[in-house]
Structure formats: C-alpha cells, structure tokens
Amino acid sequence: MSSKVIIFDTTLRDGEQALQASLSVKEKLQIALSLEKCGIDIIEVGFPISSPGDFKSVQTISKKIKNSRICSLARCVEKDIEVAGDAMSSSDFFRIHIFLATSTLHMESKLRKNFDEIIDMAVSSVKKALRYTDDVEFSCEDASRTTMDNLCRIVEKLIKAGVKTINIPDTVGYTIPNELSNIIKNLFERVPNIHKSIISVHCHNDLGMAVGNSISAIQAGARQIEGTINGIGERAGNTALEEIIMAIKVREDILGVSTNIVHKEIYRTSQIISQICNMPIPANKAIVGSNAFAHSSGIHQDGVLKNRKNYEIMEPNTIGVKEVKLNLTSRSGRAAVKYYMDKMGYKDDDYDIDELYSAFLKLADKKGQVFDYDLEALAIFSKKQENAEYFYLKFFSVQSISNGLSTASVKLKCGKKVYTESSTTSNGPVDATYQALNKIINFPITLQKFQLVAKGKGKDALGQVDILVKYENRQFHGIGLATDIIESSAQAMINVLNNIWKSQQVNKKLKNLKKY
C-alpha cells in the first residue's frame, strides 16, 4: 500500500455551495492557481452542467492549471458526463467524478429505485465517462449509511468497470471515527479487487468529526482525502484540508504517510480563499487562525521564549507564518515584556523592568491589549504622560449624495490648537473622513486593515472599528466604538494618530538623551 496520501480539494465545488453569492470566473481561477501553488493533487473545479457560468469557469481553469489534476463533478446522467468532458477537454489530464446515492434511505425516498437499478446506472455511467478520460472517480453518496453488503457489492462492480478511485462520503456528517474506519477495513477485507483502486473519503463536519473521521480512514487504508481549505462547505462544512495536511506531517510517526503539499503555502492559500469567499477565519481555528500560534498566558509565553517546543507542536514558518505572536495582556509576565523591549533594541540597563512591568499591568487592565509602542512610552515617560492625548476630535460632519460623492468636515484639536478641514471623495464617507483628518496632520500612513464588528443587536448596537496602519515601517493599531459607524471609524483613526504621536515623542526624547 502506498505511503502517499492524495489531497483532493473541492473548495471550488463543494466549498462554493456555502457562499451567499457565486464566485466569478476570475475569482475561481485565482483560487485554483493558489491551490496549484500549494501542491494540491486534485482540484475539483466545478459542476459544469449546473450553469453556463460554471461551465465557463471549468473551461477557463482547465486551460491554466498544469501541475494539479483538474476534476469536474457529474451525475449518472449522460449529458452531465458529456458536458464535464467537454469543459475539461483543453487539459492534458483530467478526472470525471461521478456520484450516485447508495443508501436505502436515498434509494427509496429520493431516487425511487432498487439497488440493482442503482448498480446498472453506476456501471453504465462509468463506461461513458471512460470515453473522455481514463481517470474516473465514483462517489457512493451517503455511503456511511449504506448497508455493508450493498456497499461491497457496488464497489466491486465499479472497480471491475474501470473506476480508479472509489470515494466513500460521510455525506451528512453522521459517522464517528471508529465506524468509518470499520467501513474502510471491511471494503479491504470483502472486496476481492479493492487493491486495483484508491479508496477515498469525503467527510462532512455536522458533528465536528470530519478531520477525525478522515484520519481514522487513513489509518484503515484510505489514500485520498477530500475536503476544502478552511473547512468551508454546506451546513457545518467539510474536512479542513490544512488540518489534515498538518496532522499527517506532525504525526508522521504514527500515521506513516505523507503528502505532496508545499507546506509553506498553506497560510497564504488560506488567507486568499478567506478573502475571496468573504468568509473570515475564526481566531481559534486550528493551523490558520490568528491565535493558532499566539500565547497570552505568562507561563506559556515564558516557556515559548525559552523553547518553542514547550507549547508549540509545529513551527509557524512551516505553514508560512512569519513569527510567534505573544499577546501583551494583563496575563502576560515579565518575560513577554522583556521580549518586546529587546525586540525594539532596548538593553536591560535602559529601563527598570520592575517599574515597567508594574506600569504595564495597570495599562493592560485599562486597555485590554498593549502594543510595543505602548511599552516604549511607558519605559520613557511618566505615568501622567502615558495617558495624554494630543489629538482630539471635537466635531465631524459627513454628507453623501446620489452621485456617489461623500464630503466630510472635521474639527481636530492638536495639542492646544484647533484645525478645521474638509474632503470630498468617491470612495465613501469613511475615506472622506480619513482624508480630511490627513489634510490636517499630514502623516504618510497606509491603511492595512479595517474591521467592523457589531457589539450587540438592533439600532442602538455599538459598532467597533479596528484598524491597522503602517507608518514609517511600523504598524500602529486603533480602536473606535460608537453607535455611528462613521464616528467609530474616525475615533479609531484618532486612536492611531495618538499612538503615532506618542511614538514620535519617544524618539525625540531618545535623541535628546543620546546627546548627553
């Protein structure tokens, strides 16, 4: 049995079914190219019979992808198979993926056919697909609820007909790991020609067991895993491929298998798909979540700084994440504070760690999360100065008209002086407000992230805006909170401007100290 596990990605087919709006041809191509770069073996790019748009997407992607095998879905219908073959005809090598339900429930209530009819339909469709390609996969839909006798019977017939890959889907996410493992083991024990085909599994996550089921299937002999990046898909989603891939890599000692994946491309691919599909990745998502390599507990931070292996089972750069993330909160210890001071270039005798840590805890209790520039200010300035705000928004007004233009007027207090400015833009009221503010302060900043989160429900709910900007090769954060989205956006930018100003004052004081 091969020690290589084939990774079959269905983000563009099964994953897209979870989206509120279909992806454009250009967006699908961008995702497909990212998957190819990541080393995905099989990319299921669509269901071409479903719509002219899907046909065009499959056709376009087939012309561009060279290093991954293209695959399209088809029912056991001659026209489906013909259209799938035509859509991929420009590809040098492709797969047709046929499916048909095999469980008693589906046969009786959905298809209204007996099992002999199901076998005849399946075998006949495989023979038609083989006219277009020698790579045919067959999925026994709802296989996990199909009787073992029927499943063994149809699998044997399909392999005899020429199917190279037999897929065993847990279509409704009903199975638990030992059950799926037993199904795979039974197929190997009872189907005499089973070794002429690769056994695949396609698990859904309705009970949160998609990854666990897939791992158990590998241990039982399955050598293809189907899923999606970030686990997107109908209902509770599909097997998260990045989790399967890294489980195989990290626990190769137990599983004894490997993949063809370029691991350093995992994080980038995950981010691209999240952005294109407009599906944010939960912070606590395994492997690719923002907290996957973040540490907030003082004990954990100290342990990671001494040796990453204390609290990390894989190195962040393995999947393309640049560095470990230590969140500075009231739970952080001295080790994390010292780590950031060292990172900024300060030496131990530049500050008193006990005084700094005491001031840090008070600020962390107040702010929640502290950033490196906050620490720097605490180390240089007094507690009184730490709370000083140089910029204060005294007034703002926004007007948007039907031609798409927005005009913002702001009155900004800068120290003891007050300035008024206005700006008109076609990019919306938030951009107009930011441009008006920048006319006053004239900081060459670049907005890198803008995130709006509703705090509560209804018309009186608060909107929290979190922004991240780049100024002179350094990142600064800002948070604004108000019932009015424009106001919370403006306050977030004011927060950023004060953080930048505070950093500038630190630099000035450091320059003065160097003179003596």
Curated annotation (Swiss-Prot):
Pathways per UniProt: Amino-acid biosynthesis; L-leucine biosynthesis; L-leucine from 3-methyl-2-oxobutanoate: step 1/4
GO cellular component terms, A-Z: cytosol
Binding locations of Mn(2+): D14, H202, H204, N238
Listed InterPro entries: 2-IPM_HCS-like, 2-isopropylmalate_synth_dimer, AIPM/Hcit_synth_CS, Aldolase_TIM, LeuA/HCS_post-cat, LeuA_allosteric_dom_sf, LeuA_bact_synth, PYR_CT
Keyword Transmembrane: no
Gene3D superfamilies associated with the record: 1.10.238.260, 3.30.160.270, Aldolase class I
Residue ranges of domain Pyruvate carboxyltransferase in the record: 5-267
Entry keyword set: Amino-acid biosynthesis, Branched-chain amino acid biosynthesis, Cytoplasm, Leucine biosynthesis, Manganese, Metal-binding, Plasmid, Transferase
Subcellular location: Cytoplasm
A Pfam family matched in the record: LeuA_dimer
Presence of keyword Cell membrane: no
Segments of this protein annotated with the region Regulatory domain: 392-516
Cofactor dependency: Mn(2+)
UniProt EC number: 2.3.3.13
Principal place of residence: cytoplasm
Family statement: Belongs to the alpha-IPM synthase/homocitrate synthase family. LeuA type 1 subfamily.
Function as written in the Swiss-Prot or TrEMBL entry: Catalyzes the condensation of the acetyl group of acetyl-CoA with 3-methyl-2-oxobutanoate (2-ketoisovalerate) to form 3-carboxy-3-hydroxy-4-methylpentanoate (2-isopropylmalate).
Subunit structure: Homodimer.
UniProt name for this protein: 2-isopropylmalate synthase
